[in-house]
From Swiss-Prot:
Family to which this protein belongs: Belongs to the RNase E/G family.
Coarse class of the protein's main subcellular location: plastid
Keyword line: Chloroplast, Endonuclease, Hydrolase, Magnesium, Metal-binding, mRNA processing, Nuclease, Plastid, RNA-binding
Species of origin: Nephroselmis olivacea (Green alga)
GO molecular function term, any single one: endonuclease activity
Record-listed E.C. numbers: 3.1.26.-
Name of the protein: Ribonuclease E/G-like protein
Subcellular localization: Plastid, Chloroplast stroma
Top EC group: hydrolase
Cofactor annotation comment: Binds 1 Mg(2+) ion per subunit.
């Protein structure tokens, strides 16, 4: 469950890779802080352990703003607040009362459990990152392994690793996911450019050993230019087929997660099917031929899938990485003609697309390689 304002969004598909919370007191009103919820046993009569559960909160940033865990007094939460679970992060109001500080939950901002996500408005690339396991500041985001992020103009959603690795290990080729953030603030551009060179490049180098279909929608122009420059330098020309305009179009990202359970398999008139899946890296479209589908019908299925994918992108407000697995050996020249029509269709709805690479037979290897790493 993800709480954005008063709206609850289901992002349970991200629970397998842990939780990262990004928050900062500087962006919050005076007296507000971020708190960590821990489970404790209370004491009953005669000092015996009570069977009733109590929940305490440990503010990660104090009202003085000195740093994490400098205000670690545990506070008992009662009443309806008991819906909280161990590991939750909450937004709290910290009120000075003489030599003590009282902590109150801010209604409507109960955030997450240890396997959930949280969104705080108004964040920038300079904000603090907290892990529910460590609760410490991570410098420059560079210690984070398997970080996948999505960002709107005023909100950010992050998923993170089960464990942290030191920077020197993260810089090696052990990365299992693309690392990408959508950030519009100027402060984030230089960081993301360097991150592309350090982290995305080694992953791309391994992936682009095979022809690969990757559609990138909804990213910052400067970041996209940086990745394109790297591709021209490092990626074999045979793996780069089509280059189209970059984009700066943002949709409601929470539709991405809710759409993952809506019509996952779409029948095609040609007799094939298209399976849609939301993975840790983005959306994947798997076009299947079905039983007894002839070669000519396979070509029709691939062409039909192009327009079906365009329809799904518009319907589900997709952005980010979109991976497409076509059927068998197809005519790439004919496919390119269809792709031009496809991009024109999406651009009519304010989408701008960059197609990094398109191929008929290389994507399956990439998807299987990624899944085998994540299992």
């Amino acid at each position: 469950m993800l709480v954005v304002g008063n709206r609850i969004v289901d992002v349970s598909r991200h629970t397998s890779i842990g939780t990262i919370v990004i928050a900062t007191v500087d962006k919050l009103a005076p007296g507000l802080g971020i708190a960590f919820v821990s489970w404790t046993h209370g004491q009953g009569k005669g000092g015996l352990p009570s069977t009733k559960k109590h929940y305490g909160i440990l503010p990660l940033r104090s009202w003085r703003g000195r740093g994490p865990l400098d205000f670690a007094t545990t506070h008992e939460l009662t009443g309806e607040n008991l819906i909280l679970q161990h590991g939750d992060f909450v937004l709290v109001q910290i009120v000075q009362d003489g030599n003590h500080a009282k902590v109150h939950l801010v209604s409507g901002h109960i955030a997450l459990t240890t396997s959930r996500l949280v969104v705080w408005p108004g964040l920038s690339s300079k904000d603090w990152i907290f892990s529910h396991q460590i609760g410490q500041k991570i410098n420059n985001y560079l210690h984070v392994r398997k970080l996948v992020s999505y960002m709107r103009r005023d909100q950010i959603l992050c998923t993170g690793p089960q464990r942290w690795m030191k920077e020197q290990y993260a810089l090696e080729h052990q990365w299992e996911n693309f690392v990408l953030e959508f950030i519009e603030q100027p402060t984030g551009i230089s960081y993301l450019t360097s991150m592309t060179e350090k982290f995305v490049s080694p992953v791309c180098a391994e992936w682009f050993q095979h022809p690969l279909s990757v559609w990138i929608i909804g990213c910052n122009l400067q970041i996209r230019e940086s990745m394109t420059k790297w591709m021209i330098t490092h990626v074999p020309h045979k793996s780069r087929h089509i280059e189209i305009t970059t984009l700066d179009a943002w949709k409601n990202w929470y539709n991405l997660h809710r759409a993952a359970i809506v019509q996952p398999q779409i029948p095609l008139r040609s007799g094939g099917t298209m399976i849609i899946e939301f993975t840790e890296i983005g959306w994947s479209f798997d076009i299947n031929s079905g039983i007894g589908l002839e070669i000519g019908s396979k070509t029709c299925a691939n062409e039909e899938a192009i327009y079906a994918i365009a329809q799904q992108i518009l319907l589900r407000s997709m952005h980010g990485f979109i991976l497409i697995d076509f059927i068998g050996d197809i005519d790439l020249e004919k496919l390119r003609v269809n792709l031009i029509q496809f991009t024109s269709l999406l651009e009519q709805d304010s989408y701008h697309i960059r197609i990094i690479s398109i191929s008929a037979d290389g994507l399956v290897c990439v998807i299987r390689h990624r899944r085998s790493k994540l299992i």
